A protein has these predicted regions:
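Short, charged/polar micro-motifs that form catalytic or ligand-binding hotspots
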Residues: 39, 64, 124
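Short, low-complexity N-terminal intrinsically disordered segments enriched in polar/charged residues
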Residues: 2-39, 43, 47, 51
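A beta-strand edge to alpha-helix "cap/lid" segment located at domain peripheries
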Residues: 2-18, 82-167
């Protein structure tokens, strides 16, 4: 029995299942984008980091950093604003909530805690919320816009970021 010969309820069930599978796969892809942001930035893996953004994406980091547009703006943010300040960073995202507005657009919100050390060895703790607009183009999900709201950005006096000693 071909697709044209299937009863309408079977066709509707298959269409519904295909839509649900697509959403599950999309959710996994979007979680990977959020993780690749952290991994790419923290490990200085530029190719991984830039691959998550649409060419004309907007990255609103907010004060004290600013807003940046497109791959060139994002490159400027990373290499001229952020990396020159930070010796190392460790981003941890959690509580990712995704809402699909249509099959090719989604909205996401997650929290991030980032511990980092500046080039002058001051350990900082940052807590923020990322709000993302994701878009799928040519079957690939990417970030179209990320807005950052920083809740706190504090130094931790006396803290050091050193690996454990091997004894």
């Amino acid at each position: 029995m071909g697709a044209r010969e299937m009863p309408n309820d079977v066709q509707a069930t298959i269409a519904s299942l295909m839509q649900r599978i697509d959403e599950l796969e999309s959710r996994a892809n979007l979680r990977d984008l959020v993780s690749d942001y952290c991994i790419g930035f923290d490990t200085h893996d530029w190719d991984r980091f830039i691959s998550i953004w649409h060419r004309d994406a907007i990255w609103e980091i907010g004060p004290p950093f600013g807003s940046f547009e497109g791959h060139e703006g994002i490159r400027k943010a990373v290499f001229e604003v952020l990396y020159p300040v930070w010796r190392e960073t460790h981003h941890l995202t959690t509580n990712l909530r995704l809402t699909f507005t249509d099959p090719n657009r989604a909205h996401g919100t997650c929290n991030v805690d980032c511990m980092g050390a500046t080039k002058d060895n001051v350990v900082q703790m940052i807590s923020a919320t990322y709000t993302d607009d994701f878009e799928r183009s040519e079957k690939v999900w990417k970030i179209a816009k990320r807005s950052v709201v920083i809740h706190y950005f504090n130094s931790i006096p006396g803290a050091q970021m050193t690996p454990p000693s091997s004894s």
